[in-house]
């Protein structure tokens, strides 16, 4: 599963960046779990810069009623979750 501070893949010339938000009370490896609608830090491609939110996650694993994000799940800007917990998984 993806946690606050784990990286996305980036897209086009927009580089990878860390997720900015997570659950206030659900932790994975002592780090807040990242969920659908949680924020991502801004990233840039020259002058254009944008932030984003988590678009999708597990179909049946939730934290605080929100789907948990996993490696490969889409970020709303076109990136995907990349880094993740080494030992906690949701749906394989």
Locations of regions flagged by a protein language model:
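Intrinsically disordered, low-complexity proline/glycine-rich segments
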Residues: 1-92
């Amino acid at each position: 599963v993806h946690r606050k501070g784990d990286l996305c893949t980036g897209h086009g010339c927009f580089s990878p960046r860390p997720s900015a938000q997570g659950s206030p009370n659900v932790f994975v490896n002592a780090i807040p779990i990242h969920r659908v609608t949680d924020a991502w830090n801004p990233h840039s491609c020259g002058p254009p810069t944008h932030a984003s939110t988590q678009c999708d996650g597990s179909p049946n694993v939730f934290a605080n009623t929100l789907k948990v994000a996993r490696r490969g799940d889409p970020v709303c800007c076109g990136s995907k979750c990349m880094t993740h917990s080494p030992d906690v998984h949701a749906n394989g």
